[in-house]
């Protein structure tokens, strides 16, 4: 066999081979015998099917298996010549040429290797971190909100007129052109006036009503209303108000602290203020990281940490980005790409820079996670998806199964690891005082969130 290998850089090698057709044919009998042991053909006992019949019926499979076996042998010899162990391979080799000639095959393939990454410049990559300080005014605002959120609603006298922040119990039905519309009728519906739970004009129409009162009013749905069949249309609503309850706002004192921090011993107002201040700091930190610093850190990692990337993995990522783009294209654009291969190649090529950066950052994050022993347990992935399902009104089990079926669980896990790695290094650049706030918050993270 004529085999040539070339090491392009630390992450890429190339092989060229010209195995003879005879070499391929020598493999036919052995492969046919394996197939004969497994298949069942009418008129023959299992394992007793004539080899000639197996070769005829399974010719395509035998040819394919023989080619795969031959290529694996070529790859094994190529790795041996290059001094590379199979554990250092990453992904599958990219077969760039496989042509059958009169007496031989012409085969070429790119081989991707796990990159060598030196992380000595990581400190240079982490931007300075200045999280906005939490002042007393912000703490007091949050305390007022907590006093409101934990307040109870109490019954009012029959003469009270509905006002903002009251809790109403109502029946209502909506009509368009005097015909009830789908989803427009509800009984014993609870609504806090001014909460924007319903359309603003709907809530305004209820102001001043009294318990037992009935009212009719018209409003126009916004043109961008989520229910398309109602968008921009005028509707008549008939409403009956059953009950008005007023919010009994709690005082900001130790009693409020005991309610909010119900699971903590010795809960008092000063402890609540400390928890609130810490929570506000965390919110400021997360917002700064997500809106600015994580992306800045990624850009610095991309710019300063240099190493060879396996071309095979970049090509796979380009394929993925191209396929994902096709899903969001109009049918006409997809058809245009199908009919014009050159245009399709250009479109795929347009993803090269994004694919290269994505692959590079993934390798860096993986290396940093291993060095710092940062990981994500499978249960944490499921918890994240469970929370996503609750927030979007989906069935958690169905959502998790959907991710599993589409092989997306690994991507979710990698995204969570990336977030933890970036947060870990940004937290290192916090001031000493802010790091102390973080340390105080961590033991209480699973207890109470005062937000």
UniProtKB/Swiss-Prot annotation:
It is an enzyme of class 5 (isomerase). It catalyses: [protein]-peptidylproline (omega=180) = [protein]-peptidylproline (omega=0). One of its GO terms (biological process) is protein transport. InterPro entries: PPIase_dom_sf (IPR046357), PPIase_FKBP_dom (IPR001179), Trig_fac (IPR005215), Trigger_fac_C (IPR008880), Trigger_fac_C_sf (IPR037041), Trigger_fac_ribosome-bd_bac (IPR008881), Trigger_fac_ribosome-bd_sf (IPR036611), Trigger_fact/SurA_dom_sf (IPR027304). Keywords: Cell cycle, Cell division, Chaperone, Cytoplasm, Isomerase, Rotamase. Pfam families: FKBP_C, Trigger_C, Trigger_N. It comes from the Bacteria. Its main location: cytoplasm. The keyword Nuclease does not apply. It is found in: Cytoplasm. One of its GO terms (cellular component) is cytoplasm. Its EC number is 5.2.1.8. The keyword Transmembrane helix does not apply. Residues 165-250 form the PPIase FKBP-type domain. One of its GO terms (molecular function) is peptidyl-prolyl cis-trans isomerase activity. Belongs to the FKBP-type PPIase family. Tig subfamily. Involved in protein export. Acts as a chaperone by maintaining the newly synthesized protein in an open conformation. Functions as a peptidyl-prolyl cis-trans isomerase. Consists of 3 domains; the N-terminus binds the ribosome, the middle domain has PPIase activity, while the C-terminus has intrinsic chaperone activity on its own. This is Trigger factor.
């Amino acid at each position: 066999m004529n085999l040539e290998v070339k090491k392009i850089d630390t992450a890429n090698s190339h092989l060229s081979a010209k195995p003879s057709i005879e070499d391929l044919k020598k493999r036919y009998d052995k492969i046919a015998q394996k197939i004969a042991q497994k298949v069942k053909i009418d008129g023959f006992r299992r394992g007793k099917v004539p080899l000639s019949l197996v070769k005829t019926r399974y010719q395509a499979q035998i040819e394919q298996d023989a080619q795969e076996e031959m290529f694996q042998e070529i790859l094994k010899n190529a790795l041996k010549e290059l001094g590379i162990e199979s554990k250092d391979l990453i992904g599958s080799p990219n077969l760039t040429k496989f042509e059958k000639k009169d007496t031989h095959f012409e085969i070429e393939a790119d081989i991707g290797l796990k990159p060598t990454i030196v992380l000595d410049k990581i400190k240079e990559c982490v931007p300075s971190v200045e999280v906005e300080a939490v002042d007393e005014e912000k703490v007091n605002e949050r305390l007022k909100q907590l006093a409101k959120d934990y307040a109870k609603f109490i019954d009012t006298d029959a003469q009270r007129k509905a006002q903002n922040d009251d809790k109403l119990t109502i029946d209502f039905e909506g009509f368009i052109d005097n015909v009830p519309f789908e989803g427009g009728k509800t009984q014993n519906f609870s609504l806090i006036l001014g909460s924007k739970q319903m359309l603003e004009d709907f809530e305004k129409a209820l102001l001043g009503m009294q318990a037992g009162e009935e009212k009719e009013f018209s409003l126009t749905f916004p043109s961008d209303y989520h229910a398309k069949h109602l968008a921009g249309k005028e509707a008549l609503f008939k409403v009956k108000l059953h009950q008005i309850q007023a919010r009994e706002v709690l005082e900001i004192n130790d009693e409020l602290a005991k309610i909010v921090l119900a699971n903590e011993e010795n809960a008092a107002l000063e402890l609540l203020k400390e928890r609130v201040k810490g929570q506000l700091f965390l919110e400021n930190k997360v917002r700064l990281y997500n809106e600015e610093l994580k992306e800045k850190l990624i850009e610095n990692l991309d710019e300063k940490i240099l190493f060879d990337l396996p071309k095979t993995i970049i090509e796979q990522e380009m394929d993925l980005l191209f396929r994902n783009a096709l899903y969001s294209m109009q049918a006409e654009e997809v058809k245009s790409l199908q009919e014009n291969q050159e245009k399709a190649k250009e479109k795929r090529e347009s993803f090269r820079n994004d694919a290269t950066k994505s692959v590079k950052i993934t390798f860096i994050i993986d290396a940093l996670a291993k060095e710092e022993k940062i990981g994500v347990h499978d249960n944490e992935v499921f918890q994240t998806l469970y929370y996503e399902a609750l927030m979007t009104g989906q069935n958690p089990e169905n959502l998790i199964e959907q991710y599993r079926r589409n092989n997306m669980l690994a991507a979710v896990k990698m995204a969570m690891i990336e977030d933890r790695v970036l947060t870990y290094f940004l937290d290192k650049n916090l001031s000493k005082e802010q790091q102390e706030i973080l340390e105080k918050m961590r033991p209480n993270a699973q207890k109470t969130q005062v937000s």
